[in-house]
Amino acid sequence: MNGMPYHSTGITRHVTSGYLRFHPMLTISLFVVALLSAMLPVVALNSLDLYVQAAKEGAAGQSGGYTYQISGGSNDVAEELRQQVQNGKAIGVKSTRGSVGITSASGSSRNTIADITFLTGPSRYGTLIEGHQPSQKNEISLSRAAAEQIDAQLGDMVTVQCEDSALSSDYKLIGITVDAANTNTVYATAVSSKDNLQNIQMWLTDDDATVNQGKVAKESATNNVNIGYIKSTIRNAEETVRARDLPGCQWYGIVLFLCLLCVHIAVMTAFFRAGQCSGDAVVEALVACGFPLTTSRWTVFRGLLICTIPGAAIGIAAGYAVFGLSYRTIGSIFAQYWEWQPSATSLLSIFFVAAILLCSLCLTWLVLFFRISFKHDITTRNALWYIIPSSAVLMFSCVAIERYHAAAWPFGGSVGSVMGACALGPLLLSLPWLFRTPAQCSAIERTRSLSAPVCALALLLLGASSLFSGQMMIATGNSDNGLFIADYLTQDDLNYLAGKYPETLDKAIVLTAPDESRYLVRAATSHAYDCVIQHGSDDADCYSDSDNETTVMLVDSNSSLAGKTNDVHIAEGGNAGIILIDPATQKITQAAQVPTEGTDSLLNDYTMPGVVLGIDSPQAKTLGLAPSNRHTLVITDFPSIASGVRDSIRSDIINRCGYAFITEHDTTSYRSYMARAIAMPALATIISGLTFAALAISTRQSQSALRWTLQEFGVSRFQLMRLFRPLGITMSLGSTIAVFLGWLGSHPWIVAPANKFGTTGWWWLIPLPVIFIETALFCWWFSLPERRNQ
């Protein structure tokens, strides 16, 4: 046999195939695991991609589908745009609520209430699924939900009734569309005569010259005309979906990757070490026959490749096949309309699966064949080199955390919790209980140089994840939660929203920007205002500090905010300094002190104006302030509104008012922080669990000879398990203390009153149950007698 060439492939092939036949259940299990772990990412990642794409397509369709949305402006702007409508370069739009229905041959009618959009030209609203978009006078398209409610078919005459009698008429149904982001939306889009649309609310155009020239461009410079861009609308919709519906999806992607990686490694390891004819036994037999060690290992290891690579390839193909057959059904679960075809983005899941397979094979090779030799002087004095510095670091961390809670060291909580968690590993592995028996002393001294730094890193990760999770949960409790602000709305936009959401708009606050075509209106702090009085109204240096500047808004004189300021822009006498700035020269042209009605905490938010004056107040008249067509909608209790209504309001503003700017303090930040608060402990659990598992396996391998010697002397299983006690205590007790230190470092219960913050939640405790279960399993495994391959 020794004369046989080492690269003799015939024998090694028979050995590999024989090993697979000898372990049929494990071979099938490995193949199935590879197949399923490839199918799952393909379906999940493609579903996520189509979810976002549907939101973007829905935003584009509901915004009108044209490059620009134009709203607001003076009568001169309206006249200019009407001329563009007549020239075919722009389309007038009017949206309202009304009834759509059909009358059957028997005389019975079926009606439903819908959002109706009237256009002067071709429609691009919605995603067309049947027929074609209306483009001629008296043509209409219905959403699929509206058509189903009235049982309408293409070619039917649809009766439209609304508050505008000129638009109430019969229209021919020529198209069925759908809001790709929400298929339950009930709406209709009709083309009417160009002469019928009075009080046009908005104009749509693809013509760059329309928005960049003439009166539209002139008034847009002073915010009197709002211009929305379809690209911005799509981008805002995508950001909203990623922040609200899919917060932390990248973190959960990493968690999925690590979970599948763990499953692969576990099944591959079991495949190699299972049964009496294990991979180790086959490797030893091949080495005894004269094959090199690497060739012997590869002979068995490639059996893993034979199972996993075909399984993953079939899983990828099956995943795309399943997704191709079911993506419409999956989309309907989320009330979305999905269209899918293979693209470069959809193929990213292949790289995801390939990365899992490659990493699992590499790590499995290390787990199976990597060996570390330990050569240390077995003496208890070596423990002092770990106990003394780690104890000092732990004491310092406790002091740092105490100083943090005493409001002395702002970063003491973070630094102390991380350093303390890091010091726990070497300290617990070196405490005196390890030296009660010579066997324990010998076992731990041989592995401490590896286990101490590894445990330190694992516990550091657990402590940091607990700290991070607590901080993220506290961040969700900020005092500005619940505020919803939509800026740059026009009066027509407000009328539309008030008609659709009357209860919400009745409780909301509507701020109106002053007309700034002649001068900019700003409020100044007392220091900035005094500087203007002393050095002259044209001294811009007095007003150069941006912290001293805030906007001034107008509000209905009966509003509770009329005459109010924030805490910064009110002088000692209760007045507020108002400064008027020439927009052309940026010079201060006028300054005046106006009396106020006190302060309001709502105006302290950075997104709110610093001073609010009543529209008809003497202060506004003295300054010559006139209202513009730019409005800001403020909803102070947005989370208390039903979830469906919140989503509808948000979508209407994003899609129908592409020029609007939304600031939302509740759901986006809350969900994003919540996702991170969950994902970080989950990631730390997986990584630290794998680290402890690898360390435990390595520790048992290093104790193999010692354990065999102890067995020959007749030790019990409990005594064998005691060899794992130092590492087990470090894993369980160390993890508990580490996450508790992280929680202490994140909890500001002494630094500031608790009512100013949220709670730390309980997600930081995620690692502990997993680590406890893992410790118990390794205790059982270490209690098993050592087995030698025959």
Predicted features along the sequence, with ranges:
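Conserved positions within well-ordered secondary-structure segments
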Residues: 630, 635-639, 656-660, 723, ...
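Alpha-helical transmembrane segments, especially those used as permease/efflux helices
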Residues: 1-33, 40-43, 245-264, 302-313, ...
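Short amphipathic alpha-helical coupling elements at transmembrane boundaries
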Residues: 18, 53-60, 284-288, 441-446, ...
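Membrane transport/envelope proteins' first extracytoplasmic loop
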Residues: 1-265, 269, 274-278, 307, ...
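Juxtamembrane segments of multi-pass membrane proteins
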Residues: 418-419, 433-582
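Interfacial "coupling" helices/loops that link adjacent transmembrane helices in transporter permeases
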Residues: 23, 265-306, 377-378, 691-729
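The feature marks short, hydrophobic/small-residue-biased sequence motifs that occur predominantly
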Residues: 44-45, 87-136, 175-176, 509-617
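Transmembrane alpha-helical interface segments in multi-pass membrane proteins
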Residues: 285-326, 712-750, 755, 774
